[in-house]
């Protein structure tokens, strides 16, 4: 990710390091020597944008969901603001962060307000801004100079959701077996049989009896794993394991 950013913005200063090694002080404490060094190097900061690790609050995480040590890194955004004092702040995460067992989002909001920031918090769905996918994310907007509003963002930039067909219909004519990006994968025979079953029976959700044992007749949240996307609707949230 950093290499891509550096290619897009030549000459920009890149720092690849854990945030807690740069801002190592406790909230409410005086700036540490390391923090003062970072501040001197940064100078004035107009906008700070942060996306703390979301795995610990993802609904797809069945191991450390809502109680992951990495969730505490959300609070490093509050410490950054305390030390650097950026004029505007944007924090993005999965909606599950709002239900973290240690209330990292709520504690961050309280700290930002104590620092004099005006806040607007809420959940936005990209399909409400013209995307062809359902993807909800928690946003925190904070500013020292005005009252931010997620509602205004919805009003100014909201748009009708686009369909899956709008995004990928052209791929039907773009198949190139010699191209990594334009060639379909070769599913295993069992997977191909399930795919054909959906189309042959005009179904969008694979019946339990057609699923493998690990996802058969169980109370799970992976319904779409063996489903078919609706061409005339936005896609469900696409994950790396889709």
Please report, for each region that a protein language model flagged, where it lies by residue.
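Core alpha/beta nucleotide-donor-binding catalytic domains of modification enzymes
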Residues: 1-85, 95-99, 106
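Conserved beta-strand scaffold positions in the cores of enzyme catalytic domains, especially
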Residues: 14-16, 119-123, 237
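Residue-level detector of flexible, active-site-proximal loop/helix-junction positions
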Residues: 19-23, 126-128, 175
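Short alpha-helical segments and helix-capping/turn motifs at coil-helix boundaries
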Residues: 29-35, 123-127, 221-224
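Extracellular/periplasmic catalytic domains that process cell-envelope and extracellular macromolecules
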Residues: 40-42, 132-134, 229-232
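Short catalytic/ligand-binding loop motif for oxyanion handling, primarily in non-cytosolic enzymes
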Residues: 55-59, 97-100, 130-133, 147-150
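Conserved Class I SAM-dependent methyltransferase catalytic core
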Residues: 72-142
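S-adenosyl-L-methionine-dependent DNA methyltransferase catalytic core
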Residues: 111, 137-242
């Amino acid at each position: 990710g950093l290499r891509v950013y550096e290619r897009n913005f030549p000459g920009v200063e890149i720092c690849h390091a854990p945030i807690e090694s740069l801002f190592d002080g406790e909230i409410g404490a005086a700036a540490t020597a390391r923090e003062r060094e970072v501040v001197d190097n940064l100078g004035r900061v107009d906008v700070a944008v942060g996306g703390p690790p979301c795995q610990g609050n993802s609904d797809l995480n069945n191991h450390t969901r809502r109680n992951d040590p990495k969730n505490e890194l959300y609070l490093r955004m509050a410490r950054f603001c305390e030390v650097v004092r950026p004029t505007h702040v944007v924090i993005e995460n999965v909606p599950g962060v709002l239900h973290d067992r240690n209330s990292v989002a709520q504690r961050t909001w309280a700290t930002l307000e104590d620092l004099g920031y005006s806040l607007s918090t809420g959940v936005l769905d990209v399909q409400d801004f013209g995307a062809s996918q359902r993807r909800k994310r928690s946003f925190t907007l904070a500013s020292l100079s005005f009252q931010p509003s997620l509602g205004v963002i919805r009003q100014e930039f909201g748009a009708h959701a686009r369909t899956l067909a709008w995004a990928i219909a052209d791929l039907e004519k773009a198949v190139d077996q010699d191209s990594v990006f334009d060639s379909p994968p070769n599913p295993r025979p069992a997977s191909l049989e399930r795919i054909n079953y959906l189309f042959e029976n005009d179904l969008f959700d694979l019946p339990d009896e057609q699923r493998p044992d690990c996802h058969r007749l169980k109370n799970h949240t992976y319904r779409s794993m063996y489903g078919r996307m609706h061409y005339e609707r936005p896609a469900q949230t696409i994950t790396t394991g889709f």
